[in-house]
Amino acid sequence: MTLLKYYIRFVLFIVLSLVFSFHLYATDNAGPILIISSYNPDTRNTTANISEFMEEYKRGGGISPVVIENMNCKSLPEAPLWDGKMRGILDKYKENNTPQLIIILGQEAWASYISQEYKPNIPVLCGMISKNAILLPDSDLNVAEWEPKYIDIQEYVDKGLHLGGFLYSYDVKENIRLIRKLYPQTQNIALITDNTYGGLAMQTLVKKGNGKYQGSELDITGWKKE
């Protein structure tokens, strides 16, 4: 069984536990399970996650309707618009249409969700995101001048956000230790990322720890102000 299948089945177990417990109190008009995806559902990873979830959910006896919303996030310069896209999606699912559960796939959708001033009191499961994140910039900010602040998702759990799922956790210090162990003559280490939300979030994580790593600071390349 692939790691993805283990992940899907674990998430499904949580979903069914939550949904069935809600049915004890819900009416016949229980709301849907809402999946919010950063990307077009036709992309390979997104398709695999959603398809396997749907198969396992039905196989496990799930009967609640599942609704998929796509934010269609593309390049980083669009980041100031993502907050509004997420707000528009959440506004569609209120009152009698309130979801029993929200599943968020992708870092852009996740960043858009935690950037909301108001978050519905609904359990959230997430996938395809990392433990380190950055809040989205204001709509009037030039993204090229953006200096994002690192945040740890654990902070939101500590504040009472009903959150579960799998997170990617990057141990920069351990990676540096491994590099120096395998290549002891190494004098300089550079982090090179693409100019995406994930790349910028990784840069922010590394900058947060710069000066704490044994040896020289890392050179960071990838985000250029224009």
Q: Where on the chain are the PLM-derived regions?
A:
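Short hydrophobic alpha-helices and adjacent helix-cap/hinge residues
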Residues: 3-5, 24-226
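Bacterial N-terminal signal peptides
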Residues: 10-21
